[in-house]
Swiss-Prot record:
Its EC number is 2.7.4.6. GO terms for cellular component: cytoplasm. SMART domains: NDK (SM00562). ATP binds at K9, F57, R85, T91, R102, N112. The gene is ndk. Its main location: cytoplasm. Major role in the synthesis of nucleoside triphosphates other than ATP. The ATP gamma phosphate is transferred to the NDP beta phosphate via a ping-pong mechanism, using a phosphorylated active-site intermediate. Disulfide bonds: none annotated. It comes from the Archaea. It catalyses: a 2'-deoxyribonucleoside 5'-diphosphate + ATP = a 2'-deoxyribonucleoside 5'-triphosphate + ADP; a ribonucleoside 5'-diphosphate + ATP = a ribonucleoside 5'-triphosphate + ADP. This is Nucleoside diphosphate kinase. It is an enzyme of class 2 (transferase). It comes from Methanosphaerula palustris (strain ATCC BAA-1556 / DSM 19958 / E1-9c). The active site is at H115. CDD domains: NDPk_I.
Amino acid sequence: MDRTFVMIKPDGVQRGLIGQIVARLEDKGLKMVAARFERLAEATVNEHYREHIERSFYPSLKQYIMSGPCFLMVWEGKNAAAVVRTLTGATNPSEAAPGTIRGDYGLDIGRNVIHASDAPESAAREIALHFPGTGQVTYTRIDEPVLYE
């Protein structure tokens, strides 16, 4: 099974959307294997979003991510990164399809509720950054034999 990283951003936490987002991922058959609240430090934000540091929007993105607690999670399932990205929807909520997390809950591109790794490689990097060596569990959900052959 593959693992991917998901972060509910400060606007999602403040709006009480954690339960709805977790339910959508679980309803899809994914399994949460790690989770915690954290107010991210500047160094962690810089490493997480390192590909955006030189972009003009980065200072406001960093301020937003550091403005409140985030809910960090690792999810497991077949093609986990691709499945979660599909459920998440387009980065810009105005372009995200209804029924996706951003389509239903995102307000604008600057307050889009959720981050999800875009590929297995970035998932591995983000999991190592946010859950280094500890905090992940292995278990079998009762429905796994039905969901996965």
